[in-house]
Amino acid sequence: VRTWYHSWRAAIRIARRDAWRFKGRSFLVLAMIALPILGVSAMDLTIRTSELTASESLDRDLGRADAKFTDPGLGGVPILQNPDNTQYTPVKDYDNEPWPDGKADVTKAIPVGSRVLTDTTGNGKLRTKHGLLNTRIHELKAADPMAKGMLRLNSGHFPEKTGEVAATTHFLETSGLRVGSKLTARSLDADYRIVGSYELPNELKADEVNALPGALLAPLDKALKADQLPGTDPSTVHLLTVPGHSFTWNMVQKVNTFGITVDSRTVRMHPPAKADIPLYQKSGWSDGRSEGSDVTVLASAATVIGLAMLEICLLAGPAFAVGARRSRRQLGLVGANGGDRRHIRAIVLAGGLVIGVASAVVGSILGIALTFALRPTLENLTGQRFGSYHFRPLELAGIAALAVLTGLLAAIVPAINASRQTVLASLTGRRGIRRSSRVLPVVGLIAFLLGAAIALYGSTLTDQFAIVAGGSAIAELGVVALTPALVGLFGRGGRWLPLSP
C-alpha cells in the first residue's frame, strides 16, 4: 500500500467484504440512514411535482385561450392591475368618495378579430338520491378546443345539446347518480341527461355540473325568481383568442381603461419589469414577495436536516464501533504487516462510506418509487392534480450526498478509537483496564446547560433558527457525554431496588 489511491481502494474492498459478511448489522445501519433519505427524496420530488409550471397552470386557468376578461364590478372606471391578475385597484383615489360599483361593458374592450368563448358560473340546488345538493353550475362549451385543459373528461362526452349536462366525478359519488341518469333542479320542471363525467384539475372535490351556455342557469334563475327564491347568482368571464395569439402587456393596460381585468398567457409567461407596472408605483402596493420568508424556510430546513443527521450519527456510531471491535484482529493483522494508523482509520471510515453510498442509492430509489406509488393518494388528499414529474438532479444528488456524509460522520469516532489500539492489544483481544474520565461528565453537564440556554435564547429572543439548531446540537452532545456517568449513577442506585419478578 504505497499511495493514497491504492490505500483507499484496499480499504473499500475490505469494508465491502465486512459489510456483506455481517449482513444484519449492515442492514440495520443502512436502514437508519436510508429511511430519512427515502422520506426527504420522496418529499422533494412530491413538492416539485405538485408545483405547476407556468404553462401547466395556464392550461388549467385559460385552456387554450390567449386571455381571460373579468369584470371586477367597479362600474367600468379605469383600473390598474398586476401581471398575474391577483391585484387591482381604480386609477383614481376614492378616499373621500363612494367606492365605484356596477357592471362594465366587456364587449367594448374586446379587440377586433378576436374569437370569444363565454364562461359562466352560478349555483343551484339539484335533486339527488339523497335529497337536494347545492351545486355549482358551469356553463361553458367544454368541447370547444379553446377550453381544452380546463375540464378533464373521464367518461362519456361533454354536452352537445341543450338537454345534456356533464358532472364532476365527485358530484356523481356524492349524489349517487351516474352517467346516463336524469338530473333535475329545484323549482325547474325540465330534465337533463348526464352524458359524461369530468374533473377539475385544481378542484377534485368540487360538486359541479357543466352545461351549454344558456341551457341551465337562465331557465333555473327564472324559475327560482318565480317561486320567490334566491337566484343562481351567475357571473361571466370571457375567454379570447386574438390574431397572432399574443396578448401583450400594452394590450392589457388598454383593456384596463374599460374597467376590465385581464389574465394574459403572454404576460404570465413573460411578465414585464416591475418599473413598467403602474400599480406598483402607487403607494401601498407591491408584488407581495418577501425574501425574509424564503430565508426562514431555508433556515428551518437546515435546522431539521442538521439535527436529523446528528441523531443518525449518534444511533449509527455504536454500530460501527461494534463492527470495528469485532474486526480488531483483522485490523491488528493490518498493523502487523506494516499498516499504520492512517490505514486503520481508512478501513473503518470506508465502512461508513460503503454503507453511506448504499443508503443513498437505496433511499433515493425507494423515495422515487414511493412518490410514484402514493401520487393518486396525495392528489386526492390535496384535492388537485399534480403536474408532470419534475426531477431536480442537483437536489436529489444533494440529498444522496447527505447519506454518504452521515455514514462517514458516524464512523469517525470508531475509526479514531480503532487506530489508537496497539497491534498487540488488537491481536490478543485484550483491552486492558480502562478508567472512566472524570472530566467528561463535567464537560457534558456544562455543554447541556449551555446548549439549552442557547436554544432557549434563540427561540424566544431572536428569529435565528441557526442559533436554535446550534444550541440543540450542543445540548444533545452534552447528554451523550453525560450518558456513562448517568448509567453508573443509576447502576449504583439499583442496589436499593427490589428484584424483578
Protein language model regions, located:
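Interfacial "coupling" helices/loops that link adjacent transmembrane helices in transporter permeases
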Residues: 22, 314-356, 427-431
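Small-residue-rich transmembrane alpha-helices
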Residues: 318-320, 329, 353-383, 396-420, ...
